[in-house]
């Protein structure tokens, strides 16, 4: 038996899944101040339906990291950069507390310029004097040689043990220095909050006496273990939108071109499925104005949800925040959900309360309640359609989007909008009708996020870089470095076997060994190194992954 729990900003949803059937579902308000209690409430409603059967795995999706970064509530964090030669320092506008230091490594990992120890001492003293307790360190080509990052890390540990540090070579083995620096910075900013969240999960699991694998849903639609997430919490950014994307795919499953529209209480998430495959952001997740090395779906969030409150200020306003539940569910203020409830005669909750609160606002606005509802419905539909169309303009630049048009020899055409979330039944059919496409709603659409979390499989990508003339190799994630036993005649097949073995080792460490056989290579590159008039060796770059997808036993659910 499997449990999926989606911890949203407004509601926490849970699903108990067994052998192709959803056995139980639950939806509870999220208590940000006491998250453990929310998790316990969800577990307490799901577990009785499991009886004596063992819960094999529990998967959580969460907006914790997304909300921390979006609201600017992350703790003040410093970034020490060793950019070497190239771009001017003002090109790296990543954060306010940024410090540049000398020290250069070339693209082969050779040290060109050593650290200036006095300069580093001065930078660390300034960081400590400012009261900053978190530091990210990023050196250009540290994925080829991390010696300078390690030196700074060791100095911080020795001289300032109360300051936590994250280094880029442990976060990502990929090239593109600005993205690696940004990813490391956001990791350092969120790691302590994530550790607290992980501790609350562990406490809730322990208090209910469960002996289950605990996984977290990542931005790429796969999962990793809770322990692994504590080292790379940034990979959980957009975990919520990933859950809705996989949940929408799990419920619909046909090979159609679909927009997944997840209408939550506070926000709406938009994602695209092309021919049954989610569209990925080719440049990685974008946090603010910065691209990162986080693999993620191409998603967008709109500050509009079913609980978005309504107001009058010279005109009807649909606010980008909530003041509690919809009136039909006992709230004190009229919301988007209430307007759709009355306009479409949906009979959701206490429809009389919806009508009463809307009538009060209509009187304030000097209009009939029916006109108020009409205006709200139009505002919401137009705002969502505008957001979808803006996303299409962005998606047109994604390689997978263009490839689909080339392969199918026709322009991309949207087939349907998949509705996810409690408010989807009210809003999505209206949006789809206005866009002249089909809408898809399932009985389990309100808890599709939790279903998506429950039935996706663990994922892992390993990248190996080998430089035979320098007798060096590196493996990511984790910042593994080593020397070659035989650097003479290494061939691509040997490099692939080496990458496969590291993937298997990491799978064993993370309890994913049973999925290792499903791995595939996504990058196989080799380059000859010429010295004088002859070849002196080769450089290999190999990538192997267990790609995102559903667990083998998932074949869909019945309505």
What is each of the regions a protein language model found here?
Residues 1-559:
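N-terminally biased helix-coil "hinge/interface" segments that flank
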């Amino acid at each position: 038996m499997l449990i999926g729990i989606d911890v949203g900003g407004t509601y926490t949803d849970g699903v108990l899944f067994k052998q192709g059937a959803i056995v139980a579902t639950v939806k509870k308000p999220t208590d940000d101040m006491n998250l453990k209690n929310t998790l316990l409430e969800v577990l307490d409603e799901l577990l009785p339906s499991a009886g004596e059967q063992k819960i094999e795995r529990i998967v959580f999706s969460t907006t914790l990291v997304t909300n921390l970064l979006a609201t600017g509530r992350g703790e003040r964090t410093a970034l020490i950069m060793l950019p070497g030669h190239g771009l001017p320092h003002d090109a790296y506008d990543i954060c306010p507390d940024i410090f540049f230091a000398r020290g250069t490594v070339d693209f082969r990992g050779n040290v060109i310029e050593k650290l200036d120890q006095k300069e580093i001492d001065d930078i660390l003293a300034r960081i400590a004097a400012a009261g900053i307790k978190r530091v990210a360190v990023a050196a250009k080509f540290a994925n080829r040689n991390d010696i300078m990052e390690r030196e700074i890390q060791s100095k911080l540990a020795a001289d300032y043990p109360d300051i936590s540090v994250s280094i880029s070579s442990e976060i990502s083995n990929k090239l593109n220095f600005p993205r690696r620096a940004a990813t490391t910075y956001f990791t350092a900013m969120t790691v302590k909050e994530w550790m607290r969240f992980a501790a609350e999960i562990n406490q809730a699991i322990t208090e209910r006496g469960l002996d289950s694998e605990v996984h977290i849903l990542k931005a790429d639609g796969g999962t990793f273990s809770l322990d692994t997430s504590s080292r790379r919490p940034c990979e959980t950014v957009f975990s919520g939108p990933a859950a809705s994307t996989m949940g929408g795919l799990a419920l619909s499953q046909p090979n159609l071109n679909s927009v997944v529209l997840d209408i939550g209480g506070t926000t709406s998430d938009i994602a695209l499925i092309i021919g049954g495959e989610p569209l990925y952001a080719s440049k990685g997740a974008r946090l603010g104005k910065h691209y990162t090395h986080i693999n993620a779906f191409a998603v967008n969030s709109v500050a509009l949800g079913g609980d978005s409150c309504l107001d009058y200020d010279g005109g009807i306003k649909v606010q980008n925040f909530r003041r509690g539940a919809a009136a039909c569910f006992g709230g004190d203020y009229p919301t988007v959900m209430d307007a759709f409830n009355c306009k479409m005669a949906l009979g959701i909750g206490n429809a009389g309360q919806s009508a009463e609160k809307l009538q009060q606002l209509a009187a304030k606005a000097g209009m009939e309640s029916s006109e108020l509802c009409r205006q709200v419905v139009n505002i919401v539909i137009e705002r969502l359609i505008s957001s979808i169309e803006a996303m299409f303009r962005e998606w047109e630049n994604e390689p997978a989007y263009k490839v689909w048009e080339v392969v199918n020899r026709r322009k991309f055409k949207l087939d349907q909008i998949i509705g996810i979330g409690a408010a989807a039944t009210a809003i999505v059919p209206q949006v789809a009708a206005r866009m002249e496409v089909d809408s898809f709603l399932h009985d389990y659409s309100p808890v599709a996020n939790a279903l998506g979390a429950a039935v996706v499989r663990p994922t892992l990508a390993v990248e190996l870089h080998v430089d035979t003339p320098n007798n060096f190799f590196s493996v990511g994630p984790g910042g593994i470095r080593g020397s070659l036993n035989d650097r003479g005649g290494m061939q691509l097949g040997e490099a692939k076997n080496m990458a496969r073995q590291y993937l298997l080792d990491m799978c064993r460490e993370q309890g994913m060994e049973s999925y290792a056989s499903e791995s595939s290579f996504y990058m196989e590159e080799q380059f000859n190194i010429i010295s004088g008039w002859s070849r002196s060796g080769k450089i290999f770059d190999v990538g192997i992954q267990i790609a995102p997808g559903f667990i083998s036993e998932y074949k869909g659910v019945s309505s």
